[in-house]
Swiss-Prot record:
GO terms for biological process: light-independent chlorophyll biosynthetic process; photosynthesis, dark reaction. SUPFAM superfamilies: Helical backbone' metal receptor (SSF53807). The keyword Nucleotide-binding applies. It comes from the Bacteria. The lineage of its organism: Bacteria, Bacillati, Cyanobacteriota, Cyanophyceae, Synechococcales. Its EC number is 1.3.7.7. The gene is chlN. Belongs to the BchN/ChlN family. This is Light-independent protochlorophyllide reductase subunit N.
Length: 418
């Protein structure tokens, strides 16, 4: 274990809820539909988060719980049945329908598991129903994907075939690139979870080796282990360093010589480091403060310090799974301050006291900080953008160099007018 400084903090939080994950999950599985059982606030959140990204009829919606539902004066189950029947009659192409719980549905104890069971019997052979919680009562927004994948694990058939399973949503082009690299390394049976079609779930078993692409899938990992899968612990594939070690860990699990891995990835790494240079010129020596929201913070801190030369003031993370993050923690400087959890007022006080050059935070905090003259980067962009892999290292760095470059340009223009 690294000697980083680990701290815990509790108090008021400022994060999105797990419903936000629907935005990238519904892009990943175009044959699925996500039906949020929640309030009008839930509907507004999803529409706002996804509205700018939808270029066709969306594959998500909200079954609205009215005030009389929340007060127990109406049967929410009847209304949900009506919405589902109407939806399936209008959208016969739906193969999997996710019933997504929310804060309101959990408050009134709406049993979506029982609802899903009944609907599976009614629509047997036509539509598969799966339920999970996207509530933000005790979770952050990326855990919505964890809940969705965990709900799918029991539906995955068993196999003894040896395979590498990449777990966590990736952009399709990044997934294709990863599979191609692994094929060159010598691993030919590579599958992804979630798959591109919700009905084509990979089979798993004792010879399935799981390599995570995202750090926020603790519950999914636990269930995959219970199914007999072997978990490969590695840094996450962000940047040249993390991606290289990730490929090496995957190869080692299949007893492939690391010289073969280096032979395949060395040309990619050299090109990526050259592409990084224009960004490191801007980022090197700049002070970075990461507020907790996505659970990507530790991996991002490692990349931005080790490969881009940024100075880490504080690395916040909503939750810290030490088993999954140990390899990442070992790559951080020993004096790195990591804070698990959040007391948003205290953290904002520390931001103001340390005057960072860049703060990675949620959208709700970005505008107030910008108004105080502090450059920010939305953490949710890291989930919506294709940032994984050696080839994407420069694009990842660019997400952080651009706000600093913009600030430099604005500052120079302001000075020129005086």
């Amino acid at each position: 274990m690294s000697k980083v400084e680990l701290n815990k903090e509790t108090g008021p939080r400022e994060v999105f809820c797990g419903l936000t994950s629907i935005v990238w999950l519904h892009r990943r599985m175009p044959d699925a539909f996500f039906l949020v059982v929640g309030s009008r606030t839930c509907a507004h959140l999803i529409q706002s988060a996804a509205g700018v990204m939808i270029f066709a009829e969306p594959r998500f919606g909200t079954a609205i719980l009215e005030e009389k539902d929340l007060a127990g004066l109406a049967d929410a189950h009847e209304e949900l049945d009506r919405v589902v029947n109407d939806l399936i009659s209008r959208r016969p192409e739906i193969k999997t329908l996710f019933l997504v719980g929310s804060c309101p549905s959990e408050v009134i104890k709406l049993d979506l598991a029982t609802v899903s069971e009944k609907l599976n019997k009614r629509f047997l052979g036509q539509v598969r129903f799966v339920n999970y919680s996207g509530s933000g009562i005790e979770t952050t927004f990326t855990q919505g994907e964890d809940g969705a994948l965990k709900a799918l694990v029991p539906l995955m058939e068993s196999t003894d075939d040896e395979k590498l399973l990449l777990v966590g949503t990736l952009a399709n082009n990044v997934e294709d690139r990863f599979k191609k690299i692994f094929n060159h390394i010598g691993i030919t049976n590579v599958e992804s979870f979630p798959p591109r079609q919700s009905t084509e779930l990979p089979k798993i078993g004792k010879n399935t080796k799981v390599l995570l692409t995202q750090p926020y899938l603790s519950d999914t990992v636990r269930d995959l282990k219970h199914r007999g899968c072997e978990i490969i612990y590695a840094p996450f594939p962000l940047g040249v360093e993390g991606s290289s070690k990730w490929f090496l860990a995957g190869a080692d699990a299949f007893k492939i010589n690391e010289l073969k891995v280096h032979e395949v990835i060395a040309p990619l790494a050299n090109r990526a480091r050259q592409a990084l240079e224009k960004h490191t010129e801007i980022l090197r020596g700049k002070k970075l403060f990461l507020l907790p929201e996505s659970q990507l913070e530790i991996s991002l801190a490692r990349f931005l310090h080790n490969e881009c030369g940024m100075e880490l003031i504080e690395v916040g993370t909503p939750y810290l799974n030490k088993d999954l993050m140990d390899e990442e923690l070992n790559l951080l400087p020993d004096d790195t301050k990591i804070v698990e959890g959040q007391h948003v007022e205290k953290q904002l006080d520390r931001v103001r006291a340390t005057s960072p050059d860049l703060v990675v935070c949620g959208m709700g905090l970005a505008n107030p900080l910008e108004a105080e003259g502090i450059s920010t980067k939305w953490s949710i962009e890291m989930v919506f953008s294709p940032i994984h892999g050696i080839d994407q290292a420069a694009d990842l760095a660019g997400l952080f160099s651009r706000p600093l470059k913009r600030n430099q340009i604005l500052t120079s223009k302001t000075l020129a007018t005086h």
